[in-house]
Amino acid sequence: MKAKEWREKSLDEIRQKNKELEEELFNLRMRSAAGQLESSAALGKIKRDIARAKTVLREKGVKEH
């Protein structure tokens, strides 16, 4: 998801999606440790999405205060 798409979401939606992404990252890491991960690129994609979500949360948090 692009940063522009993240910025269009509400704070609650961003927090929920971020939680889902962190759970998915955990699952991918477990699969990687077990040797069952097909593509390590998926880890990077999830990490980037989490970073984008956190960045937008911080931007919106600063604007509201």
Curated annotation (Swiss-Prot):
A GO biological-process term: translation
InterPro entries according to UniProt: Ribosomal_protein_uL29, Ribosomal_uL29, Ribosomal_uL29_CS, Ribosomal_uL29_sf
Pfam families found in the cross-reference section: Ribosomal_L29 (PF00831)
Keyword Ribonucleoprotein: yes
Record keywords: Ribonucleoprotein, Ribosomal protein
GO cellular component, one term: cytosolic large ribosomal subunit
KW Ribonucleoprotein (keyword) present: yes
Superkingdom of the source species: Bacteria
MF GO annotations: structural constituent of ribosome
Entry similarity comment: Belongs to the universal ribosomal protein uL29 family.
This protein's name: Large ribosomal subunit protein uL29
Lineage, uppermost ranks: Bacteria, Pseudomonadati, Thermodesulfobacteriota, Syntrophia, Syntrophales
